Swiss-Prot record:
It comes from Mycobacterium leprae (strain TN). The gene is rplW. Transmembrane segments: none annotated. GO terms for molecular function: rRNA binding; structural constituent of ribosome. HAMAP family: Ribosomal_uL23_B (MF_01369_B). Part of the 50S ribosomal subunit. Contacts protein L29, and trigger factor when it is bound to the ribosome. Keywords: Ribonucleoprotein, Ribosomal protein, RNA-binding, rRNA-binding. This is Large ribosomal subunit protein uL23. GO terms for biological process: translation.
Amino acid sequence: MATIADSRDIILAPVISEKSYGLLDDNVYTFVVHPDSNKTQIKIAIEKIFSVKVASVNTSNRKGKCKRTRTGFGRRKNTKRAIVTLAPGSKSIDLFGTPA
């Protein structure tokens, strides 16, 4: 396994869906992460980037869907998601930014 140098290379993007949006009230956040990262690296990266205390990290590997194209079949890439639960009393993460 290769080491990942920067925390921002581990956390790729937040997942914005109905399910993940509903979990924001419980201080549970979902992120797309680098496929080679482990739970410890994800926890350290979240704590470093957002200055919060992480209680737990759950990960899931998602297979890419097969999609039909004009020339045959293609495939979306496989992704890894991390569901991060913040510790009680920790400040929340502002994913959407403040309104202008």
